[in-house]
Amino acid sequence: DRVYIHPFHLLXWG
């Protein structure tokens, strides 16, 4: 988890 959430990170997680 990151303090800053970016759409690109969400893609990675999802």
Curated annotation (Swiss-Prot):
Lineage: Eukaryota, Metazoa, Spiralia, Lophotrochozoa, Annelida
UniProt similarity note: Belongs to the serpin family.
Source domain of life: Eukaryota
Protein name: Angiotensin
General function of this protein: In leeches, the angiotensins are involved in diuresis.
